[in-house]
From Swiss-Prot:
Its EC number is 2.7.7.1. Belongs to the archaeal NMN adenylyltransferase family. This is Nicotinamide-nucleotide adenylyltransferase. HAMAP family: NMN_adenylyltr. GO terms for molecular function: ATP binding; nicotinamide-nucleotide adenylyltransferase activity. GO terms for biological process: NAD biosynthetic process. Its main location: cytoplasm. It comes from the Archaea. It catalyses: beta-nicotinamide D-ribonucleotide + ATP + H(+) = diphosphate + NAD(+).
Length: 173
């Protein structure tokens, strides 16, 4: 049995992520999906909480025929210990899929098999672009699986994003 690890911020989860995960699912038996930067929320580039992102991913993958686990992963300030941090919070995995150069480097240095996951129509399926559309009041729902749009609407995520994107709210407490 082969279990893979794939991490993303999923701010929000979109069809690009969905295509990559579907492709990974063809190659492995189980998949651990890490919700990266889990401690971040209520910011312009990270508007959604870890729990909200877990729901987005879980609901979007409900019909995927692969056993999967969705695990929040907080950032650590030291890249040299990040892989150990990830491993300590997830079920064991055999292979890592990523297109992030730092993630690839860190996991390779730690002795993991790493496969690069190509971006899927990046210019269209980008969290940055989807958040921009939300802020500007443009259509965005067609860029995410329906269950993701439903999760975002359930807590009025677009209003939150608009509120935290205003200049007066861009400060840390």
């Amino acid at each position: 049995m082969t279990r893979a690890f794939y991490i993303g911020r999923f701010q929000p989860y979109h069809f690009g992520h969905h295509a990559v995960i579907a492709r990974i699912a063809e190659e492995v038996d189980e998949l651990v999906i890490g919700i990266g930067s889990a401690q971040k929320s209520h910011e312009a580039i990270d508007p959604f909480t870890a729990g909200e992102r877990v729901l987005m991913v879980y609901n979007a993958l409900e019909h995927l025929s692969i056993r999967h686990y969705v695990v929040p992963i907080e950032d650590v300030r030291y890249n040299s210990i990040w892989v150990h941090h990830v491993v300590s919070r997830t079920p064991r995995f055999d292979v890592v899929y990523s297109n992030n150069p730092l993630v690839i480097q860190l996991f390779r240095e730690a002795g993991f098999c790493v496969k690069e996951s190509p971006l899927y129509v990046r210019e269209r399926y980008s969290g940055t672009e989807i958040r921009r559309r939300m802020i500007e009041g443009e259509k965005w729902e067609h860029l995410v699986p329906k269950p993701v749009a439903e999760v975002i609407k359930s807590f009025d995520g677009v209003s939150r994003l608009k509120n935290v994107s205003t200049s007066d709210s861009n400060f840390s407490l």
